[in-house]
A protein has these predicted regions:
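Residue(s) in the substrate-gating loop at a strand-loop-helix junction
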Residues: 3-303, 307-309
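Catalytic core segments in nucleotide and nucleic-acid processing enzymes
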Residues: 1-50, 303-457
């Protein structure tokens, strides 16, 4: 059960929880009233086909998994936010990143700084608003080749809107930028039976259709039109979002008026293959948004009926990509590789098995593995680190011949106090392994350092 529900996190038809949080039909009644039963049943139907995203704790309770984002059904929206904070402690106010904090963030990802002192307990400052929604948006903005990257939406706007409305606002903001630069037109071949001669006369069709009507001409002409594939996709996205939004309906209706001359896309896949010329490359980000909404192109495609609409992202992947982005930005001269492969744990009859792919690899120096989890501080002997994670680190050290391993956890409200309780660990390499290229057993122990990475709240 969720227990106490924070009313600040409930907005209109949106119910907010954090990763791995459980909730029942009774928890929904505070906002959905008589619709709570129907909304819960719709979420149950979604969970039956998509247990990776939403599961059953028991017969009467659903539970979120490690995916964040939104699930919208006919009756409402379930908003799943990162587990960095407790919703009861969430402060509904602007928490815009200052220039100083951005500099502090970057500084904490410089490699020679990472290996030194732990991040200060008051890194974020006193009375800081740990806003999970702002965190999610800021992490999405660091994703490669994603439309989130260029969004200019403010933290204040984010804090005042449900997550789905934030995504819609980002799309509309991008559309506004495209409109100011000019909607793209192109020459389209049109065949039409006209009352006047225009373009090339199509003799075979002309004879078939105009044997009686001598005053008509069946012709083919090239028309410079707005009704092209990219604009059809944009109009189709606007039409979809008109049925999803409560905050932006008027703005979407006004935007649709700009596309009066444009039809709706009848084949998304085909229209997305349209080649954008370099003169109109400013369309690319907007079309990426169209893909997200029209084809659900997030990290997590889901199954089910059209009644459900979901935009979901795995937090482990978001955290890994965010840390990689910050490390590369803070250490431009280092060759930082993501998901580096080429090493296998075993070889069976000449076939390699069990590929080892650390999250981040700095060649011949360090392996960094991100863990989007809250270490258990009660496990004193294990320092809150899962045994399976240590086994994994040992395998990395052996195969990549690395002495320095770093486990990276998130620094947030729930991990601030853990920094001083989790100690640095060492594998006694003399007892356990020797690197093949060495003439003698390894003299240096393998250091495993636990690091708490600051997040972009």
């Amino acid at each position: 059960m969720m227990g106490k529900i924070n009313q600040k996190m409930i907005n209109n038809n949106t119910f907010s929880i954090i990763e791995h949080q459980a909730f029942s039909k009774e928890d929904l009644q505070g906002i959905f009233k008589e619709k709570a039963k129907k909304f819960y049943q719709e979420l149950e139907d979604f969970a039956k086909n998509n247990e990776n995203f939403l599961g059953f704790k028991n017969k009467n309770t659903l539970t979120a998994k490690n995916y964040v984002g939104i699930i919208q059904t006919k009756s409402g929206v379930l908003e799943i936010l990162p587990k960095c904070t407790n919703l009861d402690g969430y402060k509904d106010k602007e928490c815009k990143l200052s220039t100083i904090l951005k500099e502090k963030l970057l500084k904490n990802y410089i490699l020679n700084q990472i290996s030194q002192a732990k991040t200060s307990e008051n890194f974020y400052g006193e009375d800081f608003a740990f806003n999970p929604k702002t965190l999610l948006i800021n992490m999405l903005k660091t994703l490669k080749n994603s439309p989130f990257k260029k969004s200019q939406i403010s933290s204040l706007q984010i804090s005042k809107m449900p997550l789905l409305e934030v995504f819609i606002a980002m799309f509309l903001d991008e559309l506004d930028g495209v409109y100011k630069k000019g909607l793209k037109k192109d020459y389209i071949s049109i065949e039409e039976n006209r009352n006047f001669l225009k373009g090339k006369l199509q003799f075979s069709q002309h004879l078939k259709q105009n044997l009686v009507h001598k005053e008509r001409f069946f012709t083919q002409s090239d028309e410079f039109m707005l009704d092209i594939a990219p604009n059809r996709l944009i109009k189709s996205t606007l039409n979809l979002l008109k049925s999803k939004t409560t905050h932006h309906k008027f703005k979407i209706i006004k935007a649709l008026e700009m596309f009066d001359e444009v039809g709706f896309s009848t084949n998304y896949e085909k229209d997305f293959t349209y080649k954008i010329s370099r003169h109109f490359d400013y369309y690319e980000n907007l079309l990426s948004w169209c893909k997200i909404f029209l084809q659900n192109q997030t990290f997590a495609p889901y199954k089910g009926k059209n009644e459900a609409f979901a935009l979901l992202f795995p937090m482990e992947k978001l955290f890994e990509d965010y840390v990689a982005h910050m490390l590369k930005k803070a250490n431009p001269t280092q060759n930082t590789k993501t998901q580096s492969s080429g090493k296998y744990l075993i070889s069976k009859k000449g076939e390699k098995c069990f590929m080892l792919k650390p999250d981040l690899y700095i060649e011949n120096e360090t392996i960094l593995d991100t863990k989007w989890k809250i270490p258990d501080s009660n496990e004193d002997k294990k320092h809150g680190i899962a045994q399976s994670d240590l086994y994994q680190m040992f395998a990395y050290a052996c195969k990549f011949k690395i002495h320095d391993i770093k486990l990276i956890y998130p620094l947030c409200e729930r991990t601030m106090s853990l920094q001083n309780t989790i100690k640095e660990l060492e594998f006694n390499a003399n007892e356990h392994l020797a690197f093949l290229n060495d003439n003698s057993p390894l003299k240096t122990n393998i250091k495993v350092q636990v690091i708490f990475a600051p997040l972009p709240f």
